[in-house]
């Protein structure tokens, strides 16, 4: 970053402003609003300065370096380039922060564009590179931030000490304030300027928060691309105090989790269950009963082969509040990024999703039904049993010439798509790594025309790869 954003407390501190025109007038109003003890150096002043002449000291003379004595901050706002340069050089020699208006090269600090909801202040800056863009951003933020935001901050300041007495844990207080600030009830009371009612609402909330249990939100992280997160999923992971995540959740998505949250890996890979499901269930209950806002973050959609239903059953038995944020499942996301439509009027009237894992009782799926030619078959976690899947489909009537694709790390920058026919499935699977999705059906052939993502990634058929290896 070119500049460090920070807020300076100028109340009663000496600040020098050089200039007496309209630009200097704007800076004077801003500095006085911040409580600065302002000295203004200029032979002449705009008439409007006289409206608040009793709030600053005016020296009707040209600037000299001696004017810097005792100042902590300096602003040059003249149209005289030589004067501005002298102010900059003199202040620099004394190690003072100096701003030359509209001259970033001669400024050790700059004034940002400000959205004022005192005591809430929002500052936006481009470092002088794009002032029009900054103005547009400020206008957008002005329209988004409610006018009662400052009043809400003042109110919370009055209740803050009481919150510390009632809720000894920092995490408990943080949770209380997050829920309060998100409450439409509190916002409505403040909108009506019912300050007494709003303060009473907060105090009542503190009494309830003392014995409050936490909650769990089951969140689908989508297939990998952070851009495919839903807005609600993003909100939940940024509000979470504890996040239990699977190995399928991409690092880019984990980077979006709030920095002070506790991250717990309960990752699973096919054939390598690093954390038993029972332990995951125990952790969910333990963290929630400690009063935490817990997010259970799963790749894809939590109810699509993600054991989300099993985890919610445990929470229900324990009386822990929960909610669910669906995600884009890999079958929808990865195939779209691979240019493979799941259904097509000419090729597939339906799509079937199955898991390649064996059921606990060893029962086989209905292969006769899965081998139907008018549907697309999508197999999650099927690499390890690819040879068995291939044999069963062919033996139950699916043509060995049926187009197939294996989508590896779908929707991410490392996406790779291996294509071939059903006869090649086991051989292609041996070249793929998890997480991968197997797609079987005539729609795969459309990829040759519809592929759009991952230019330069592997798109050859099994036959071409075999030739290159010979």
From Swiss-Prot:
Pfam families: CysG_dimeriser, NAD_binding_7, Sirohm_synth_M, TP_methylase. Residues 1-202 are annotated as: Precorrin-2 dehydrogenase /sirohydrochlorin ferrochelatase. Then it catalyzes the NAD-dependent ring dehydrogenation of precorrin-2 to yield sirohydrochlorin. Finally, it catalyzes the ferrochelation of sirohydrochlorin to yield siroheme. GO terms for biological process: cobalamin biosynthetic process; methylation; siroheme biosynthetic process. Keywords: Cobalamin biosynthesis, Lyase, Methyltransferase, Multifunctional enzyme, NAD, Oxidoreductase, Phosphoprotein, Porphyrin biosynthesis, S-adenosyl-L-methionine, Transferase. Pathway: Cofactor biosynthesis; adenosylcobalamin biosynthesis; precorrin-2 from uroporphyrinogen III: step 1/1; Cofactor biosynthesis; adenosylcobalamin biosynthesis; sirohydrochlorin from precorrin-2: step 1/1; Porphyrin-containing compound metabolism; siroheme biosynthesis; precorrin-2 from uroporphyrinogen III: step 1/1; Porphyrin-containing compound metabolism; siroheme biosynthesis; siroheme from sirohydrochlorin: step 1/1. Residues 214-470 are annotated as: Uroporphyrinogen-III C-methyltransferase. It catalyses: uroporphyrinogen III + 2 S-adenosyl-L-methionine = precorrin-2 + 2 S-adenosyl-L-homocysteine + H(+); precorrin-2 + NAD(+) = sirohydrochlorin + NADH + 2 H(+); siroheme + 2 H(+) = sirohydrochlorin + Fe(2+). The active site is at 246 (proton acceptor), 268 (proton donor). Its EC number is 2.1.1.107, 1.3.1.76, 4.99.1.4. It comes from Aeromonas hydrophila subsp. hydrophila (strain ATCC 7966 / DSM 30187 / BCRC 13018 / CCUG 14551 / JCM 1027 / KCTC 2358 / NCIMB 9240 / NCTC 8049). The gene is cysG2. NAD(+) binds at residues 22-23, 43-44. S-adenosyl-L-methionine binds at residues 223, 299-301, 329-330, 381, 410. In the N-terminal section; belongs to the precorrin-2 dehydrogenase / sirohydrochlorin ferrochelatase family. The modification Phosphoserine is found at residue 126. InterPro entries: 4pyrrol_Mease, 4pyrrol_Methylase_sf, 4pyrrole_Mease_sub1, 4pyrrole_Mease_sub2, CobA/CysG_C, NAD(P)-bd_dom_sf, Siro_Cobalamin_biosynth, Sirohaem_synt_dimer_dom_sf. GO terms for molecular function: NAD binding; precorrin-2 dehydrogenase activity; sirohydrochlorin ferrochelatase activity; uroporphyrin-III C-methyltransferase activity. This is Siroheme synthase 2. The keyword Repeat does not apply.
């Amino acid at each position: 970053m070119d500049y460090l954003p920070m807020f300076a407390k100028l109340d009663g501190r000496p600040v020098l402003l050089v200039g007496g025109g309209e630009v200097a007038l704007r800076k004077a109003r801003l500095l006085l609003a911040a409580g600065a003890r302002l000295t203004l150096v200029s032979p002449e002043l705009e008439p409007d300065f006289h409206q608040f002449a009793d709030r600053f000291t005016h020296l009707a003379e040209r600037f000299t370096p001696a004017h810097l004595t005792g100042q902590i901050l300096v602003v040059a706002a003249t149209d005289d380039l030589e004067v501005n340069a002298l102010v900059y050089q003199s202040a620099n020699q004394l190690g003072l922060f100096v701003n030359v208006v509209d001259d970033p090269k001669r400024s050790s600090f700059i004034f940002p564009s400000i959205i004022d909801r005192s005591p809430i202040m929002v500052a936006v800056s481009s470092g002088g590179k794009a002032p029009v863009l900054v103005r547009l951003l400020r206008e957008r933020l002005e329209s988004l931030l409610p006018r009662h935001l400052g009043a809400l901050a003042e109110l919370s300041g009055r209740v803050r000490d009481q919150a510390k007495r009632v809720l000894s844990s920092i995490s408990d207080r943080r949770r209380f304030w997050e829920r309060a600030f998100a409450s439409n009830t509190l916002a409505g009371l403040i909108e009506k300027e019912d300050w007494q009612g709003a303060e009473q609402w907060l105090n009542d909330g503190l009494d309830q928060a003392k014995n409050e249990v936490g909650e769990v939100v089951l969140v689908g992280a989508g297939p990998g691309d952070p851009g495919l997160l839903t807005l609600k999923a993003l909100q939940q992971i940024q509000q979470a105090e504890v996040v239990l995540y699977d190995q399928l959740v991409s690092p880019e998505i984990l980077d979006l989790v709030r920095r002070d949250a506790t991250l717990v890996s309960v990752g699973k890979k096919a054939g390598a269950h690093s954390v038993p499901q029972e332990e995951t269930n125990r952790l969910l209950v333990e963290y929630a009963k400690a009063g935490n806002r817990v997010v259970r973050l799963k790749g894809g959609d939590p109810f699509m082969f993600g054991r989300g239903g099993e985890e919610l059953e445990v929470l229900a038995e324990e009386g822990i509040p929960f909610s669910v944020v669906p995600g884009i499942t890999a079958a929808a996301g990865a195939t779209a990024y691979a240019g493979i439509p799941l259904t097509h009027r000419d090729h597939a009237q339906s799509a079937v999703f199955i898991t390649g894992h064996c059921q606990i009782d060893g029962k086989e799926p209905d292969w006769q039904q899965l081998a139907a030619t008018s549907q697309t078959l999508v197999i999650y976690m099927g690499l390890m049993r690819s040879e068995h899947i291939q044999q069963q489909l062919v033996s139950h009537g699916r043509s060995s010439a049926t187009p197939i694709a294996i989508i590896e790390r779908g929707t991410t920058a490392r996406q790779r798509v291996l294509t071939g026919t059903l006869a090649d499935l086991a051989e292609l699977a041996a070249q793929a790594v998890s997480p991968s999705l197997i797609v079987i059906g005539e729609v795969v052939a459309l990829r040759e025309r519809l592929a759009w993502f991952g230019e330069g990634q592997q798109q050859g058929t099994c036959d071409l790869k075999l030739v290159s290896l010979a």
